[in-house]
Amino acid sequence: MTLAELLPSVGMTGEPALETGLWPLGTRLERGELLLGGVPATELAARFGTPCQVLDEGTVRARARAFREALPEAEVVFAGKALPCREVYRWVADEGLSLDVCSAGELAIARSVGFPAERVLLHGNVKTPEDLKAALGYGVGRVVVDSFDEIEQLGALAEGPQDVLVRVTPGVDPRTHRAVATGVEDQKFGFSLAGGDALEAVLRVVEQPSLRLVGLHCHVGSQVRHVAVYEEAARRVVGLIASCGVRIEQLDLGGGFAVPYLPGEGEFDLGGFAHRVRVALSHECALRRVPVPRLSIEPGRAVVARAGVTLYRVAAVKRGVRRVFVAVDGGMSDNPRPALYGSRYAVRLVRRGGRRAPVTVVGRHCEAGDVLAEDVPLPEDVRAGDLLAVPVTGAYHHALASNYNAVGRPPVVGVRDGVARVLVRRETEEDLLRREV
């Protein structure tokens, strides 16, 4: 099979239609212009420079509501690590979501916008004393404990009954990239169910007078496409509930709901998930004669990924022996996911069509592995100065950005109803030097 057969748009002329399911809700083409939140992409690039991470507020809010509507009886917790940004935390708070944070830094962002403390969960396999003290000082609703050492430390620091959940490793294969498979045995997260550590952790929490066990937590992985994985995790954790002899009020199944990054990749079946997990939970609890706990879920990527689009300016085009390289003014400092996980993206040239051929889009950094997208169809006459748009960049882009090669991180620009505003400003050379002594 040829590349043209694999990528039907290769060789076509004219401007391609927007790929279904990849762009923010309401994105449209108007007289050749790509409109994001009603704002032309060319205007965004001119006003805010490139690279520029654009975030559509309406899409974030709509995705948050979709989870609440699918599971109205459950607690929906936004995984704050996906996009730690004050405005995003405000938006999800407005939509009734709770928030999980993994550090005193993420908690500081939540505090700065007055996020209700009772709706905050503290996560992480390592929580420093500073993290725990910050959480206790703010009065976070729950702490998800992840090690025996942490149970002792938290028990010693907490002055009153602090609600906790025990993170369980259910031993379920999520069928995803090994770097984000967190529910399998023999890895750093949680207490092993099969090895007996999970039951021991429950008993140790109960023994701590300053801690109150309210629930169990598990997270099977990221980019999980199969609902059956969550069903099996729920069944296994209910088995622990039945054996521990302690009333468990909450069962948090974590997040990891897959989103499409490329044309043709399907959406996660949220409706099917809601129905099948309810049935599995009810059936297993009835079978084991334990009360059905309240369900919690923690979508992060599934709330913000599609809301994001990154704009890059083409800096150079090089024609190699076998490939055409299109080099842009960003790269692995604003998107390390291709280097970390082999992630793939679609790319669009803004405001110009033409006959297309496969190219490799590469970044500006001093690494051969700084590749943003391979074998993507772009117009054959792509040239320096062109504007490229990459969709599905709302999750783990701003969060994972670095200063490699002392390059400042790009801004995050929010768009809604034809209005654009800076949510996080571009990092400057002065910012980079400020920490030097």
UniProtKB/Swiss-Prot annotation:
Cofactor: pyridoxal 5'-phosphate
Catalytic residues, chain numbering: 366
Keywords: Amino-acid biosynthesis, Decarboxylase, Lyase, Lysine biosynthesis, Pyridoxal phosphate
One Pfam family hit: Orn_Arg_deC_N
GO molecular function annotation: diaminopimelate decarboxylase activity; pyridoxal phosphate binding
Gene3D superfamilies associated with the record: Alanine racemase, Lyase, Ornithine Decarboxylase, Chain A, domain 1
Domain of life, per lineage: Bacteria
InterPro entries, alphabetized: Ala_racemase/Decarboxylase_C, DAP_deCOOHase_LysA, De-COase2_C, De-COase2_N, Orn/DAP/Arg_de-COase, PLP-binding_barrel
N6-(pyridoxal phosphate)lysine modifications at: 81
Binding site for pyridoxal 5'-phosphate: 256, 298-301, 396
PANTHER family for this protein: DIAMINOPIMELATE DECARBOXYLASE, GROUP IV DECARBOXYLASE
Matches recorded under NCBIfam families: lysA
Job description of the protein: Specifically catalyzes the decarboxylation of meso-diaminopimelate (meso-DAP) to L-lysine.
Name of the protein in its database record: Diaminopimelate decarboxylase
Gene name, Swiss-Prot/TrEMBL: lysA
